[in-house]
Structure formats: structure tokens, C-alpha cells
């Protein structure tokens, strides 16, 4: 696939499509500036480092108010929280020059927060990979965009947040990346809003 510059997109119902142009489907994580790297003091709980599941990664980031600081610059903010769910939807959008049409495409949304009309969709991963498949964020983004367009949700803005965690000795380092899409019909229109790194320091 790398040699042929191709990637695979799921279309739903067990169908897939080969698309030319890997750059249109994978996005490299941006470098985090030194000014956006913070030492975050915390009191370790029993389950903080218990496992390395995606759910645990997002729970740690939320329980330690890191997400609140990063997204809202307010550790006492009280966003509504919606846990992992799966849903299916028909989608139509573009990737590069290709038009993609899906039917009953199943997508998994790891975590969702809403505050003052801003919906943020989360994806969590272990380690610090160089890049990620954009559809992981775009499909849920498109899902909520459709609901907004149909006036089923009163939404001001839709963003996505990628949370990465790497364990170091008895602690962790978390990197957060907040994205949106400038064109809800074009998967390659991903845009970074901000990013930051939090080094968990035990009290």
C-alpha cells in the first residue's frame, strides 16, 4: 500500500475502497512548542496507571482536569460527558479528488464532551505515534455535522481532541491535540487549533 501510495477506506456493510494519495488520509501530529509543555501536579489514584486502555487514557485526562485546562482553560468547568458509543450512518464526502459514499457505516466514538454549544469528540491512544488515520476523527465529526445541519442538535462548533499517553516509570506524559475541519465535506481539510503536553508530577 505504501509503495502504491494507497490507503483503504471503510464504506460500511463489509465494503471497502482503495484510494490513491496517503497524504489525504493520514495526518502527522504537529510539534508541541516548549511554551505549551506543562508540569501537572497530581495525586495518583488507584486506577490511574492500572491499565493502558483508550478508556483509561481519557479517564485520566478528565479526572485530573487536564482536558478542562486544555480545552476550556478552566479546571472547574463542568462540561456534559458522554461515554463510548457506536453508531451507524450514511455519509457522503470527498477525499482528494475521490467522492466517498458510505452506507450504514459503523463508527466508534471514544468519548464526547459538550460545553456551551461546543461539542468535542475524543480519540485516545497509547504511545506517541507520528501520525493517525484522519477518518478516526472525521467520521464522528461528519456525523455530528449532519445532525447540526438537520437541526437535530443546536451546536455552535464541533471540534476533535486526540489524547496520547506514554507511561514513564510510575507516571505518564499526555499530549493533547485539538482539531477541526474547515470543510465538513472534505476529509483532508483537517486543521490544528492548538496542542499541549502535560507531564504528570506526583505530589
What role is predicted for each listed range?
Residues 1-203:
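Charged, terminal alpha-helix-loop-beta segments
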